[in-house]
């Protein structure tokens, strides 16, 4: 059986008050429309078409790696009109098409699979997703036959007294036999107060043709649409709870779930402990047995097993197993830190490689450098990597000892097994086995304060 999906992503999203199309706003680090696409794909639906409109180039840019096709809706004339715009996508296809909305990011792949299975096994011409809510005010009601089949969808304003008591509501997400849908679209009109073409009318047309219409009921959170920043925040809360629950089931400890923020694509190994206030973003991988203390942010990075991070920021970098980072360290993009290293307080590292067992304990800047293993950086060391025009490279070998308050003027090379005296400014290569001293000789001028009249008596 051929299955495909159409995702409606052309809405303007006026209530978002944003220059961006609504569907590219993110929930837990991923665009809403990409949440829907990815869950459709997890349900083994490979052929996906997006109906796009306002801000189409932006939507294309955010979905370019999702292998989808596009249909253009120049004017937003209703959900039915959006599907009419995708008729070319459905042309010559036989099978089943599901229709989802790009602003409902909480739909799960399990529900999508259930929708197709229910639709196909029941031999329905159309199947819709519904939900039951305590307060259905404003929603279209699902009115069922005694057999359980869907009889009709009635908009709230058109409900009679009995229909107003119904608390099963329409989600705006459907499954259709493709041939039935295309035939029904031919009979769709905009004879209503808004002058729009409604997809709900397709259900009525299908029913009048004598075809079966069914519905599956899912939790409300799965069909919750996002039309404002308030609803975006509500969707974020639901998604964050799902994400944190998944990690806890897989053996991760959260000291406080409510104040821990993890993006949807993050992977975390078991026996990792995460303290309040941590933010883990993008395609980050945290391996097993790590401890992330409060107020740490990690983005698009790989953190090896047994790493301890405290009050620090790690961006687009790799930290080897058994390393400690922080407090208050800043690991900038393209940094690779080896195993069992120590990156201490107020240390900034940028676009550098740090070898195994190297210690950079405090108040140090390392940029555009290659640092070997078992090195020690004293407090206040600075790799001076910018010459005023371009960034230059520094190379430091294994077992180098860099004394406190040292400046390494790039480009420069410090070879294996070297010592640099505290307070030095190194501008030339330091040979292996050498002690480098590059500082002015101390001069004591005795009686100078007395001569200047500055001596306090």
From Swiss-Prot:
Active site, per annotation: 362
Keyword set includes Acyltransferase: yes
Signal peptide: none
GO biological process: one example: UDP-N-acetylglucosamine biosynthetic process
Residues bound to acetyl-CoA: 385-386, 422, 439
Location of region: N-acetyltransferase: 251-457
Localization terms from the record: Cytoplasm
Pyrophosphorylase as annotated region, ranges: 1-229
GO molecular function: glucosamine-1-phosphate N-acetyltransferase activity; magnesium ion binding; UDP-N-acetylglucosamine diphosphorylase activity
Subunit structure: Homotrimer.
Record's function text: Catalyzes the last two sequential reactions in the de novo biosynthetic pathway for UDP-N-acetylglucosamine (UDP-GlcNAc). The C-terminal domain catalyzes the transfer of acetyl group from acetyl coenzyme A to glucosamine-1-phosphate (GlcN-1-P) to produce N-acetylglucosamine-1-phosphate (GlcNAc-1-P), which is converted into UDP-GlcNAc by the transfer of uridine 5-monophosphate (from uridine 5-triphosphate), a reaction catalyzed by the N-terminal domain.
Family, per entry: In the N-terminal section; belongs to the N-acetylglucosamine-1-phosphate uridyltransferase family. In the C-terminal section; belongs to the transferase hexapeptide repeat family.
Protein name per its UniProtKB record: Bifunctional protein GlmU
Protein species of origin: Clostridium botulinum (strain Langeland / NCTC 10281 / Type F)
